[in-house]
Amino acid sequence: WMAAENADIQPDDTVAVWGCGPVGLFAIQSAIVMGASRVIAIDHYPNRLALAKQLGAEIIDFRETDVREALMEMSGGIGVDAVIDAVGMESHGFAIDNMFDVVKQKVGMGADRASALKQAILAVRFGGKVSIPGVYGGMTDKWPLGAMMEKGLQVRGGQTHVQKYTKQLLEKIEDGTLDTTFLISHRLPLEQAAEGYKNFKEQQNEWTKVILKPGMEN
């Protein structure tokens, strides 16, 4: 919700969301609730893209499509109104600069991979809005600062302000404005937490959100 709010979504906005994990999917749902007329989801896991489509988003598989070209075409050559990077430093692009980021990480130079954020900045329209809920743990280079300045973009990021949002979001869940159940892929007893984390990391197409329940029978 905060990711969508940071994107300052207005009625009839076109919004692009990178990443269809739990954060990205909830950002998609939130953007639609806030009045976006069009939401475009970018990922490559089929099941996660299917969940985004189920919510009402149009989908782009970044392994099959040039994302920036597709977004420019879908927005009439202008660029989308707002972009949300729900990927962060785990971004896996195919551009040559992303390969350099991987090499630098291997040798301990610690550059975060930021291909999703770079795509987002280049795909948003002039005067557009950039929201960054995706986590970046260190430093990144090849930042498209020139494009950001030239376009006059608004950039906001940060982890969710839990105390600010918890009460209002629980109310929206209770009154049916938001649905959280669609995202739950697995329910496990608390004793299987380690196994759940391992599967979530290694099988991201099938595992989206795990509920751990103390006392649950195996």
Please report, for each region that a protein language model flagged, where it lies by residue.
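Residues in the short beta-alpha loop(s) of Rossmann-like NAD(P)-binding domains
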Residues: 45, 136, 161
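Rossmann-like dinucleotide-binding domain for NAD(H)/NADP(H)
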Residues: 155-156, 172
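Mid-domain Rossmann-like dinucleotide-binding core that forms the NAD(H)/NADP(H) cofactor-binding site
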Residues: 1-65, 69, 84
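C-terminal hydrophobic helical "lid"/dimerization subdomain
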Residues: 78, 118, 162-218
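Structural detector of well-ordered beta-strand residues that form the stable sheet scaffold
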Residues: 16, 40, 129-131, 156, ...
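Glycine-rich cofactor phosphate-binding loops and adjacent beta1-alpha1 units
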Residues: 7-9, 50, 55-154
